[in-house]
Amino acid sequence: MVGLVYYSSRSGNTARLMERLGLEALRLPQTEPSPEVDAPYVLVTPTFADGEGRGAVPKPVIKFLNNSRNRALLRGVIAGGNRNFGDTFALAGDVIAKKCNVPVLYRFELAGTETDIARMRAGLARFWAAQEQQTCLTQA
């Protein structure tokens, strides 16, 4: 089971974050056909917004989420961005969360810090434990 799916652009910031995070993850391709997932996952994505917030969600992420199966298995989103862009910082997370009715679990800047990595690891562990507990309760 892959519990993380991520997209990283040519800048590689999100890829560097994911490498340091050290958890199994599926990387979305930039141009190839989108994969289809078969288990619940958290999406990690950068933000690409213009000054008005348009285009915040990268096109490969949109393509991936346009697959209804992929969208149905999405459980949360972690978004990256650059604080220099003010209100559009990590905006992709807010857009995806609203459209897919999932929580934004965390926001990080550029390739993240060691504090971000520690918080993400701990937060994801708590999140998946809560998801497991919820699944067990609904199956009883």
From Swiss-Prot:
Coiled coil: none annotated. SUPFAM superfamilies: Flavoproteins (SSF52218). Signal peptide: none annotated. GO terms for molecular function: FMN binding. InterPro entries: Flavoprotein-like_sf (IPR029039), RNR_Ib_NrdI_bac (IPR020852), RNR_NrdI (IPR004465). PANTHER family: PROTEIN NRDI (PTHR37297:SF1). Belongs to the NrdI family. This is Protein NrdI. It comes from Ruegeria sp. (strain TM1040) (Silicibacter sp.).
